[in-house]
A protein has these predicted regions:
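Helix-loop interface residues and adjacent transmembrane-helix termini in multi-pass membrane transporters
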Residues: 26, 80-83, 120, 147, ...
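Glycine-/small-residue-enriched transmembrane alpha-helix faces in small-molecule transporters
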Residues: 1-31, 131-132, 136, 146-173, ...
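Specific alpha-helical transmembrane segments that line the substrate/conduction pathway
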Residues: 31-38, 79-117
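Transmembrane alpha-helical segments that form core, pore/gating elements
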Residues: 44, 141, 145-203
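Transmembrane alpha-helices of multi-pass small-molecule transport proteins
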Residues: 2, 27-72, 100, 163-167, ...
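Hydrophobic transmembrane alpha-helices of multi-pass small-molecule transport proteins
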Residues: 102-105, 122-143
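Hydrophobic/small/kink-forming positions within alpha-helical transmembrane segments
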Residues: 10-15, 45, 67, 71-75, ...
Length: 226
């Protein structure tokens, strides 16, 4: 059953990517982050209330860090979607799992201190090979699909995957502390709305496009559902 939920979440995530691609023709990345967060706040507040889950938390610092890295990843991903082919932007963001594996390998080696009581951890050759293969695969994919003027957007997309890895690890840490999912996602929505609003001061706002603005609604709904 958990595998089915993961497949459904991936489908919702991909569907949101399509909506972001359509909306990016009318809104910049900061606006998309802002409206995604604003719609998510309303939905998640109602969800938490229906589940009788209090939104007050004992771990504001951890939620703030999760929101910081999550919003950085979200903004970078939305920017990449607007500038790159959708499949390329999605693949770069999905690199988060490879980044997590790289962080785990690097963290284990950095934490090890050579003493007689703590021998050097076993070399995880298969894990290292998997990480390297993942990065090589992305490089091979990007070489034929990126134009010269898309190199910066490609780097931003790669950054979205790296920061998403930090965000996912923080979500795991919060869940181990007993934080409900709806509370964690609610604070992320708040962080998205605040960060997007601040960024709009510097990036400016787009002219309201009329009916195409309806793409903002499924972005917020699918984000909350995923």
């Amino acid at each position: 059953m958990q595998a089915l939920w993961m497949v459904l979440a991936a489908f919702i995530f991909a569907s949101m990517g399509v909506c972001v691609k359509m909306a990016s023709a009318h809104f910049n990345a900061a606006e998309l982050v802002f409206y995604r967060g604003l719609i998510g706040i309303a939905i998640l507040w109602m969800l938490a209330r229906s589940q009788q889950i209090a939104l007050a938390t004992r771990y504001p610092g951890m939620h703030a860090w999760r929101s910081l890295v999550g919003v950085a990843s979200l903004g970078a991903w939305f920017y990449a979607i607007g500038k790159l082919p959708l499949a390329t932007a999605m693949t770069l963001n999905y690199m988060s799992s490879v980044w997590i594996a790289a962080f785990l390998v690097g963290g284990a080696l950095m934490a090890w201190r050579p003493t007689a009581a703590t021998p050097r951890p076993a070399f995880q050759g298969s894990l290292v090979l998997t990480v390297l293969t993942g990065f090589v695969g992305v490089v091979l994919m990007l070489r034929p699909s990126l134009d010269q003027n898309q190199a910066f957007a490609g780097l931003v997309g790669l950054l979205s995957g790296m920061t998403a890895a930090f965000a996912y690890m923080q979500v795991v840490a919060l869940s181990r502390l007993g934080e409900p999912e709806s509370r964690t996602v609610f604070y992320f929505a708040v962080g998205s709305a605040v960060a997007g609003g601040v960024a709009m001061v510097f990036t400016g706002t787009s002219a309201w496009p009329g009916w195409p603005a309806l793409w903002l609604l499924p972005i917020g709904v699918l984000a909350a559902a995923g």
